[in-house]
Amino acid sequence: MNMYNWITQQINDRNKPAFPLLSYPSVQTMYVTVKELVTSSSSMAMGMRLIADEYKMPAAVSYMDLSIEAEAFGATCVYQADEVPTIIGQLVQTQEDADALKVPKLGSGRTAIAIETIRKATRLIHDRPILANCSGPFSTAGRLMNVNEILVETYENPETVHTVLRKATDFIKKYIGGFKRAGADGVILAEPLAGLLSPDLMQEFSSDYVKEITDDLQDKNFLIIYHNCANGTERLLPQMLSTGCRVFHVGENADIEAIIKGVPEDCLVLGNVSVSKVFKGNSAHHVQMATQKLLLQCMNYNNFMISSGCDIPADVDMDHVDRFFKTVESGYYKRMLWDMID
């Protein structure tokens, strides 16, 4: 599929569908735990199909899991029944550790499962693009060096950080290449940790590396979609745009209207209904009100697509998800009616 044309189609669509990061809640219809899900390519592919069957979204998305890449490098990963796996400890502490760090082979850890998930999803889903997920270079390096430590090390030991980033980027390029060969139409590259950096440091320690990934792998048939759910990402917009990405997904605490106004008109901006306060909130009515508010604010920008501010957790109340989709559909339907009489 020509994904540049896909972007244009989304921009020109006056009746835009909702496009939340929705995959993990498939466990509710498959009666499996999150741990069982993320360790089975068949379960994950089936979950993607079931979500696609239930909701009209412009693409099918796989599972955001920021532990996979670091685990492949040898970091300790903790699995719990109903939580997304997490990395603990600090694999790289010194320059010597960074120098000794080996770039994993493709297929290490759970990367083979993630790639096979995409391959199986292409057998099940034929009516929309399929998007894989991976961590960005700085977010991967942060899990290898410890999230808090790496922020300090960008000042005190930048050479060590760059050593780890070089190896993380080399592996991520191989990993995304595996998704591409498996049939994915793009990948959502999650780089939230970079949102904690200053603009100059973000450029040096994240965006330049993401640009390398984009230059190597993005083409008309494969998109790199940039995800950063950190606070205040509007201040980092020049650094985000420098990555070469054309689709940006931002979090609940971003000024999404400022971001929409700041990107070229042929770039898509997705976001940013709060997961923690709205999707995981107390009532479907609150979901409806928050969704309507964001639609009224941004729906007249053609390159805006309403989404969740981050990936939606497995235990979300599906009534809330249903209300979100219905509210978006109703909002664009009413706009169409207004267009007919104005």
Which residue ranges define each predicted feature?
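Active-site loop segments of alpha/beta catalytic cores
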Residues: 1-26, 34, 104-342
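Short active-site-proximal "capping" loops at secondary-structure junctions
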Residues: 23-28, 65-69
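A gly/proline- and charged-residue-enriched helix-loop-helix capping module
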Residues: 82-120
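Glycine-rich loop at the start of a catalytic domain that most often binds anionic cofactors/ligands
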Residues: 32, 69-82
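Surface-exposed strand-loop-strand hairpins of Gram-negative outer-membrane beta-barrel proteins
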Residues: 32-40
